[in-house]
Regions:
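Small-residue-rich hydrophobic transmembrane alpha-helices
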Residues: 57-117, 161-180, 281, 292-358, ...
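Short alpha-helical transmembrane segments in multi-pass integral membrane proteins
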Residues: 1-28, 85-157, 207-263, 320-385, ...
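Small-residue hotspots at the loop-to-helix junctions and early N-terminal turns
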Residues: 54-65, 147, 151, 214, ...
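Helix-terminus/linker motif at the lipid-water interface of multi-pass membrane proteins
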Residues: 36, 40-58, 127-141, 199-208, ...
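Hydrophobic/aromatic residues within transmembrane alpha-helices of membrane transport systems
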Residues: 33, 45-49, 60, 85-90, ...
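Short runs within selected transmembrane alpha-helices of multi-pass transporters and secretion channels
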Residues: 78, 153-172, 180-188, 213-229, ...
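Generic alpha-helical transmembrane segments of integral inner-membrane proteins
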Residues: 32, 36, 40, 44, ...
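Transmembrane helical elements of multi-pass membrane transporters/channels
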Residues: 26-45, 153, 187, 220-224, ...
Length: 469
């Protein structure tokens, strides 16, 4: 009798009805599809480079890891101004929107110029940081050569990427979400097509290998920028902020100060997190060049499967956030419990599929047996920890939906720099343990976050309406 009551209580707390799951999936599935398309194309892109050799693949993956830090810097840089853009648009203050756009422009220009100068002066040294492990002198020299070739071309794609982020973020904050998505899909198709033509030299196109992959990426970014910028200025009736946008590039000092106060923590958080991910990869790379190749393979595969817990986590922020805004705290807590349980359950099923299929994915790449074997086990380890990551992601967005941004900052950037990176740094440099054990230890450390997240969610520190207060 007692056991029946416990089962009934568990079911009521963590399992919803059909209507509940339909509501959750209605929010989560479109996010999964959008992220799924992007990550699947990235997988195909990665496989194309991976088919031409280990050194080419490793060189490109190292550069992409470094450019990823720049990408998130830009994202963080424009996000702070975006808070003001949305409010100005809500007030129909188009001049205010123009001013926030100009702030984004200057912030992005400063970050982009700084990044280009850094890569031109110390780019080779940054790539070399990932080549300190095992491998023959020839393999290391080839990886550095291909990485430098890839980087030199990819730098040409930073300005259009910058402009796309400025325009697309402003359009979204003004309610236009479809055009940036369409432009992104076109860019993906252009990238995929020219990757195939230029990497392998199909038809009358030259066989350029890793340089072809970089050219295809840069070309796709200019196409995306042309679509977004062109559409914005051709449809000024929809985009009133575009009228007289470049009549001046001055930004009022008081607005600049306000945006810096709100936006600097966001920029800081994104930069810290991205640089920590780059540092983790560098720590693993101490164990040899094959580790760089295997991480590239496993991370690309992981990204395809991770769309499930990422989409469900985003859904928590949307659905629970709306309930908090409506002041229905009881329903918000009940919904959150069920959504966290649903996310963990879904990701446990996905993890099983991922674990079973792990030996097959590395076979798609033209690399050596050691790199394939490492990639297989890295994918298996990630699959094992996927339910943990699903729980973490859901609790992270639960706390953020209640406005606990300081806690989420501690969760995100501070934890990875104070716990994960030191573990990887010490174990990779001062012990002889296998890289797979180091990787697993870093994943295992996230259990600390799980415990903290569980306590905070259970205590209900996130149950607040930040709009009315």
């Amino acid at each position: 009798m007692e056991r029946t009551k416990e089962r009934s209580s568990f079911r009521k707390k963590f399992i919803g009805d059909r209507k509940f799951y339909m509501m959750v999936l209605a929010v989560a599935v479109p996010i999964m599809i959008q992220n799924g398309i992007t990550n699947f194309v990235s997988l195909l892109d990665n496989i194309m480079i991976g088919r031409i050799g280990t050194e080419q693949m490793s060189g490109a993956s190292i550069v992409n890891q470094l450019i990823f830090v720049y990408n998130l810097c830009i994202f963080g840089g424009v996000s702070g101004a975006g808070i003001f853009t949305a409010q100005y648009f809500g007030q129909k203050d188009h001049e205010g929107v123009r001013q926030t756009f100009r702030y984004k422009f200057w912030m992005a220009v400063i970050l982009t110029i700084g990044t280009i100068l850094m890569f031109l002066t110390v780019g080779e040294n940054l790539i070399s940081m990932y080549l300190q492990g095992g491998g023959t002198a020839q393999q290391i020299a080839d990886t550095l050569k291909y990485g430098k070739q890839y980087l030199d071309i990819m730098l040409l794609g930073l300005p259009p990427f910058m402009m796309v982020q400025i325009y697309s973020s402003t359009l979204r904050e003004c309610g236009e979400t479809v055009l940036p998505m369409k432009a992104g899909v076109v860019a993906i198709c252009v990238n995929l097509l020219f990757n195939y033509l230029l990497i392998y030299g199909v038809f009358f196109f030259p066989r350029l290998g890793v340089r072809g992959a970089a050219i295809a990426t840069v070309l796709s970014r200019y196409v995306e920028a042309a679509i977004v910028i062109g559409w914005t200025h051709r449809h000024t009736e929809k985009n009133a902020f575009a009228k007289g946008l470049y009549s001046t590039l001055k930004v009022p000092a008081n607005l600049t100060k306000k945006i810096l106060v709100k936006g600097t923590p966001l920029l800081f958080n994104e930069t810290l997190w991205a640089s920590a991910m780059a540092m983790l990869t560098q720590c693993y790379s101490i164990r040899g060049l094959n580790v760089v190749a295997s991480l590239n393979i496993s991370n690309t595969i992981n990204n395809v499967f991770n769309i499930v817990f990422i989409a469900l986590g985003d859904s928590v922020a949307i659905i629970v956030g709306q309930l908090l805004g409506a002041g229905d705290m009881k329903k918000a807590r009940d919904t959150d419990n069920k959504m966290i349980a649903f996310s963990v359950m879904c990701c446990t099923c996905v993890a099983m599929v991922m674990f079973v299929m792990a030996p097959l994915f590395p076979m798609l790449y033209n690399t050596n047996d050691e790199a394939r074997e490492l990639a297989k086990y890295l994918i298996m380890i990630t699959a094992f920890f996927m339910p943990q990551n699903a729980f973490l992601h859901a609790t992270y967005f639960t706390l953020r939906s209640g406005g606990k941004t300081i806690i989420t900052f501690l969760f995100d950037s501070v934890f990875i720099w104070c716990v994960s990176v030191p573990i990887a740094f010490v174990l990779s440099r001062y012990t002889g343990i296998h890289v797979l054990v180091i990787y697993a230890c870093v994943q295992l450390a996230d259990l600390i976050k799980c415990v903290i997240g569980f306590v905070l969610v259970k205590k209900g520190v996130w149950l607040q309406n930040i709009v009315s207060s």
